[in-house]
Design a protein with these regions (language model features):
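Acidic/glycine-enriched connector segments
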Residues: 1-116
Length: 116
């Protein structure tokens, strides 16, 4: 049964997942914010798409006790909302900080978004 895989289009795991989807006949939807370098070759999310994620991102920030200090970081976390939202199965890969208490990058945010 063909699957639809949602990815954020980053180098590394996301790129590998895109190749595997094409190899095995699965659909791959690459969701990126307008600031992403690949936005020229793919259709990026619109600002209204990103804004739709803001209420959930705000709740997740409160739950994690974290703040977003850069608009580009915000766009990537908003993008992750659109990767997580339609998912029935999530495979999250990341690195822990040196104390193994926090996931680095936006992956931790995405995992918490699963409960919203």
């Amino acid at each position: 049964m063909p699957l639809t895989i949602y990815t954020g289009g980053a180098k590394g795991v996301d790129t590998h997942v895109e190749r595997l989807c094409h190899l095995y006949g699965h659909a791959c939807v690459v969701l990126i914010p307008p600031c992403h370098p690949r936005a020229k070759s793919l259709v990026p999310l619109t600002q209204s798409d990103l804004d739709a994620a803001t209420p959930t991102v705000t709740q997740v920030a409160f739950r994690l006790g974290r703040q977003i200090h850069h608009s580009i970081s915000l766009q990537y976390i908003q993008r992750n909302y659109h990767v997580i939202q339609p998912a029935s199965l999530v495979l999250a890969l990341s690195h822990f900080d040196e104390y193994r208490k926090h996931l680095l990058g936006g992956t931790g945010w995405s995992v918490v978004m699963l409960s919203y």
